[in-house]
Amino acid sequence: MISLITYFGVVHYNFYRRHVSLRSLYIILISMWTFSLAIAIPLGLYEAASNSQGPIKCDLSYCGKVVEWITFSIACISLAITASLTGFAVISLHWYNYKSKTNGVDVPKVTTRARIRLTWTFFALIVICLIELLPFGLVIGNDKSSLQGCDSFYNANELLVQSIISSVETLVGSLVFLTDPLINIFFDKNISKMVKLQLTLGKWFIALYRFLFQMTNIFENCSTHYSFEKNLQKCVNASNPCQLLQKMNTAHSLMIWMGFYIPSAMCFLAVLVDTYCLLVTISILKSLKKQSRKQYIFVVVRLSAAILIALCIIIIQSTYFIDIPFRDTFAFFAVLFIIYDFSILSLLGSFTGVAMMTYFGVMRPLVYRDKFTLKTIYIIAFAIVLFSVCVAIPFGLFQAADEIDGPIKCDSESCELIVKWLLFCIACLILMGCTGTLLFVTVSLHWHSYKSKKMGNVSSSAFNHGKSRLTWTTTILVILCCVELIPTGLLAAFGKSESISDDCYDFYNANSLIFPAIVSSLETFLGSITFLLDPIINFSFDKRISKVFSSQMKFLRSKVFCASSSSLSRNDKIIKDQSQIE
């Protein structure tokens, strides 16, 4: 229609002005849509029936081929008629332009634009004919369009050509349909004017927006921009916002790498190692006699607590950097902190229990044999768990109240300060008590070993393993005291928070955020390293667990080597058979 209207409007202007009215164009347009729907509806239904089952039955062997050929024939006729009419109009316009130039008549710019636009339309139509008719005709001509299921697999060698044809058809068609409106709009005078007007208005709107909001965009002149700066646009009282933004980004980077990514990976590995050691310990515990089970009761408590601590560290650090569910609820933080405090206290109790068991087993063997029965050990372990629950619940509730608003209100600075120092003092007492007990037992064992060597007595391997394991446990506890008490005490003394928020207070004090970020990140980083190394080093000194681990490694090694050797022998046999055949 565009080609015919352009033809009559340029070559036969009087006919176009008298007979081609707006009403007649609407009638022709409605007729085209009606004719297209009348053909498209039945063809579309039969094409759908040939591709999937439905109310209309059309098998692929006969009906599908008939539908394909009918569709192909109608497409050929329609495209041929359209291409012929458009080609006739293009040739006529070019001939009209040539005659006008020969006669010395100036051709209007509107006519030149229409001729160029119609030439592009004709070129696009030729391309569409090629990409629609040739590939489709080749596919149905070779009878490969209905290959499905096993037929596609059996004729896989012939599917490559079909795939290339279909892909090229889609790619070239998409390029044509993308380029067509752009070139057509470019040669249309009215649409080009409207596009230029809209671009000009857009530039004015952008300039007006920058003018109105340049006072609030405090980071506009900064050389480096960060994702979190949009939350700090309201902090307009900063004297040097770019420098504060860089300081805050440094603190964020420290917290997210040394306080989240690396510790989370180490804690995840620690969970895997602790779980493996826990399963091995439980299997060993079931096979031991009552007298030998006593030393592994606290080991089970220790491993269970270490698993919970590592998981809590991952979740707690995730709340500061990831939008996890329930992170804005008091109950979530309360449960999380209660489990974390319970696990820490249970771990400290298991440390103390192992130390006392080792001390009485070496220094007071009769007391250990007669007084410390298996029932007594279970009672002590239950008492440790009960004490941990009783202390962890108020601890966790007040820690959650300090983190987020909830049923327990602690909004004033005096309340927060009192709660922080109270929790810090109680944690100091518990940690120092456990550390003192372990130091006493460790020093006693080393003194006993020194006296035995001086008297010429040879210490047993079990005693040496126990002494080494207890020395490592004491070292772990000292490190825990350092990473738990020193950073918390320093931050509480200087009135700093362990987390960094995107509010204006932290932004205005960004120069002093580096210190709490380093302290908090080191606390989490060293703690994660400790919880990863603890089970590995501890159970390398345990004879029974080391034996189980060694036997499992030997079993896996034998299985792997047997499988590889059998596969190699099988390959050698195949090669020999092939050589004999040749």
From Swiss-Prot:
The keyword Membrane applies. It comes from the Eukaryota. One of its GO terms (cellular component) is plasma membrane. GO terms for molecular function: G protein-coupled receptor activity. Keywords: Cell membrane, G-protein coupled receptor, Glycoprotein, Membrane, Receptor, Transducer, Transmembrane, Transmembrane helix. It is a multi-pass membrane protein. Glycans are attached at N190, N221, N237, N457, N538. Its main location: membrane. InterPro entries: GPCR_Rhodpsn_7TM (IPR017452), Put_GPCR_Chromadorea (IPR040435). CDD domains: 7tm_classA_rhodopsin-like. SUPFAM superfamilies: Family A G protein-coupled receptor-like. Gene3D superfamilies: Rhodopsin 7-helix transmembrane proteins. Belongs to the G-protein coupled receptor 1 family. B0244 subfamily. This is Putative G-protein coupled receptor B0244.10. It comes from Caenorhabditis elegans.
